[in-house]
């Protein structure tokens, strides 16, 4: 019934039902502002939308609302339910016809590759271009061949078109077009869940949305771990830019964060950095003092207390920057590993 209501409502407004949503289960007492607030939170992954109207349904003793979208969207992005005043609201959506969707995406992909459907058919091992519609094949024979084509091309088709993430920089005063962290994180998390692509492609799309300090954080993490996952990237951004502890609690946490047994010094520095950047963001540490603050805590928290001497850092010299410190530590760790390997070889020769 609700899908039919969506179709009839859209027909009465001369609009495409696949560019609209019906929100059902809304409390009678819910105001327009409360509906808008719930839509803003629940429909963030869909991009732009507009509340077009409301209606009371006597059989449910509830309101329904019609929401217009700027374009047809993927079924994977549309939530089945969203939280609203008085409980959970149902989201009714008329998905695109799967055959038409696949064929349009297939044709678009082939056009970009300079291929025809007939050439694709031959590439898949079908003689005489049997996938080509002009061959006059009966519809029943298309199904298995289309399924094979879909399986072969699915990775490329998934990457062909996607909604880009909103932009986030982590700057204290976001520039025009940039989101504040909370809204950006919610939207990004929802979008990433919906993407049916490999993690490496998700990470590429995530990096595409980052600017300024936020991009710098992920670049540094990638230097230490080139295979860092999207979830790890989001966790790091949450630690640096998310609103959590007050400055005093954060400072105590920073000063009591020590290197763990068997933990590499470089890993400790990377674990410490998000806390330090939070303190800088909240004004607890001046930006021009951040390098010295980092070095002081690394020396205080390291398992080996001779680390300053091991890294050849003078007592009265300027503290190295983050990347410079990591390079020094990496070189030190590499030298230690090489020495341990040589020692093991020598011991093996004399036993």
Curated annotation (Swiss-Prot):
Residues 120-127 are annotated as: BH3-like. InterPro entries: PNMA, PNMA_C, PNMA_N. Retrotransposon-derived protein that forms virion-like capsids. Acts as an effector of BAX during apoptosis: enriched at outer mitochondria membrane and associates with BAX upon induction of apoptosis, facilitating BAX-dependent mitochondrial outer membrane permeabilization and apoptosis. Required for death receptor-dependent apoptosis. When associated with RASSF1, promotes BAX conformational change and translocation to mitochondrial membranes in response to TNF and TNFSF10 stimulation. Also promotes autophagy: promotes phagophore closure via association with ATG8 proteins. It holds the Pfam family PNMA. Widely expressed, with high levels in heart and brain. GO terms for molecular function: ubiquitin protein ligase binding. The gene is MOAP1. Residues 202-205 are annotated as: RASSF1-binding. Homodimer. Under normal circumstances, held in an inactive conformation by an intramolecular interaction. Interacts with BAX. Binding to RASSF1 isoform A (RASSF1A) relieves this inhibitory interaction and allows further binding to BAX. Also binds to BCL2 and BCLX. Recruited to the TNFRSF1A and TNFRSF10A complexes in response to their respective cognate ligand, after internalization. Interacts with TRIM39. Interacts with RASSF6. Interacts with ATG8 proteins MAP1LC3A, MAP1LC3B and MAP1LC3C. Does not interact with ATG8 proteins GABARAPL1, GABARAPL2 and GABARAP. It is found in: Cytoplasm, Cytosol; Mitochondrion outer membrane; Extracellular vesicle membrane. This is Modulator of apoptosis 1. Changing residue 120 to E: Weakened interaction with BAX, resulting in a nonapoptotic protein. Ubiquitinated and degraded during mitotic exit by APC/C-Cdh1, this modification is inhibited by TRIM39. The protein is evolutionarily related to retrotransposon Gag proteins: it contains the capsid (CA)subdomain of gag. The BH3-like domain is required for association with BAX and for mediating apoptosis. The three BH domains (BH1, BH2, and BH3) of BAX are all required for mediating protein-protein interaction. GO terms for cellular component: cytoplasm; cytosol; mitochondrial outer membrane; mitochondrion. Belongs to the PNMA family. A motif (LIR) lies at residues 49-52. GO terms for biological process: apoptotic signaling pathway; autophagy; extrinsic apoptotic signaling pathway in absence of ligand; extrinsic apoptotic signaling pathway via death domain receptors; intrinsic apoptotic signaling pathway in response to DNA damage; positive regulation of apoptotic process; positive regulation of autophagosome assembly; positive regulation of release of cytochrome c from mitochondria. Keywords: Apoptosis, Autophagy, Cytoplasm, Membrane, Mitochondrion, Mitochondrion outer membrane, Ubl conjugation.
